[in-house]
């Protein structure tokens, strides 16, 4: 039985690509036809490739692998957060910070700062500070939560990255490629499929399409984790502790507050 039916794909509008004037010729093998100026994606290929991605993620998860969900476009933000939290994945749904993977040591220090400030807030220590300082810290805290809130438990680089719209998330794609981290992605007709290890041809603009495909990947990760051996979990914990000890660079509030938007 397929992990997703043709009926589900059709009802979610997964087959609708972009207008013919906005396309990448490398996506030609995944296009079925053109209708009223819009490319129609071959759902048989989508079904087959989604299944391949599903089994890849499930197998890796059963070995203790971690996965990072990435989708910062408006249509993807809510789905990415909900599905990542459901399956226990890390996620980025607001803005990809340059160097998140290639300079993870520095990013991890910012995550640690987020955790530190949240502990101050929860313990009541923040309320003991002068009002002006409280306001400044809360601004920093809100910014950190938006950008790094889905990464608090990520103590090392992820083993897999799942991306909605690799064209928009080109920096994430480049960083993952540089580090040899396999990418699973929804690839629309205007995207370049070459940098993607597991291409899922599909509509990356419709919420229903994004939700259907993302839920399949989340299911795969969840099912794999449930059967993951304890030894893999133990190794991950030990690796996390080693990575945590390596982080020495301190990021102060002023630097965080003044950080330029990408």
Swiss-Prot record:
UniProt-listed PROSITE patterns: RIBOSOMAL_S2_1
On the tree of life, the source organism's domain of life is Bacteria
Q: Where is this region: Disordered?
A: 226-262
- Cellular component per GO, a single term: cytosolic small ribosomal subunit
Q: Which GO terms describe its biological process?
A: translation
The GO molecular function terms of this record are:
structural constituent of ribosome
Keyword field contains Protein transport: no
The UniProt keyword set, sorted, is: Ribonucleoprotein, Ribosomal protein
Q: Could you tell me which SUPFAM superfamilies the record lists for this protein?
A: Ribosomal protein S2
What PANTHER family does the record tag this protein with? 30S RIBOSOMAL PROTEIN S2 PROKARYOTIC AND ORGANELLAR (PTHR12534), SMALL RIBOSOMAL SUBUNIT PROTEIN US2M (PTHR12534:SF0)
- What is stated as this protein's family in its record? Belongs to the universal ribosomal protein uS2 family.
Q: What is this protein called?
A: Small ribosomal subunit protein uS2
Lineage runs: Bacteria, Thermotogati, Thermotogota, Thermotogae, Thermotogales
